[in-house]
Amino acid sequence: GLLFNDKIEQLFETGATLGAGFIFTGIILMLAENAGKKERDLEKMKVSDPLLIGTAQAVAMLPAVSRSGMTISSALALGIERKTAADFSFLLSIPAILAAVVLDVYKMVKTGENALAAIGTAPLVLGMLFAAVAGFFAVKTMLKLIQNRKLKYFSWYLWGLGALVLLDQLVLHIFF
């Protein structure tokens, strides 16, 4: 992340990369859904499994590429059972999110930016609460999709969303 941060941030400047990221995530989810048997639990994971899953997590630094989608899909593709794949993905999110927060705080301190003063405490707290509630329901929904072998529906949603974003970016220019 630190090594390619500037290049990755440039990718967020255009909506076309968002559309491509949504479509890419949908493809990865569909491939993982259709991958072979998923029978290995945490005790049967190989030493290489976390390294491969962590590498997939790094791909999610790209715009609109889902971190949990990448980690869960890579675990499923490696033959790890669905519940273990989801649990491992959410455990991996802790250091990734903490690292992102530390990096953002460092940038704010370095540049002298004071988001708290600029935005205010109440909107920040309210935003955090809404994000936590939305995140909780998103995680619950994702776990149900994983357990019920219905990632294909989420893939279709991502393909449609990606197509709409690309259509807007390349033709309509309503949002971008």
PLM features: residue spans?
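Multi-pass membrane proteins that catalyze or facilitate reactions on polyprenyl-/lipid-phosphate substrates
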Residues: G1-F176
